[in-house]
Amino acid sequence: MTKENLLEMNRVLAELEKKNIAEYIAKTDTSFRQSPLAFWYKIEREGKGATLKRGDNVHIRFNLGLLDGSICYTPEHKGEQTITIGRYDINRGLDEALLMLREGGRGKFIIPADLAFGIVGDQDCVGSKRTVIYEIISIEKIIP
């Protein structure tokens, strides 16, 4: 396969992913907005705590699903983690999404594959080149 073929295949896959995201939003909730980084978000609760920034240690509880409606993780099963924002402990898309929240906030984020788990998936539930949907249920800043 030539470099040109690979580039064309990636372009086609990216267009298909955009179409699938647009269809999901049209069917489920048209209040999502697109971020400058090209993921989609809906802030459900602003939160009253501190604005989050890179370097903050946070504890998050989330549901992680796919566009087909399947749920991969819940707080009871791998959907609860402590991370440092800016280190990409989970993935770049979620890392950037968390910067949109305040402590105590809640939001839903549709993260395209290239900002989520990419070509390799997460080696568990999320397959290769899959768009993921994070529903952040709670986020709290951890003060060392």
Stretches found by the model and what they are:
Residues 1-144:
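Cross-family detector of peptidyl-prolyl cis-trans isomerase
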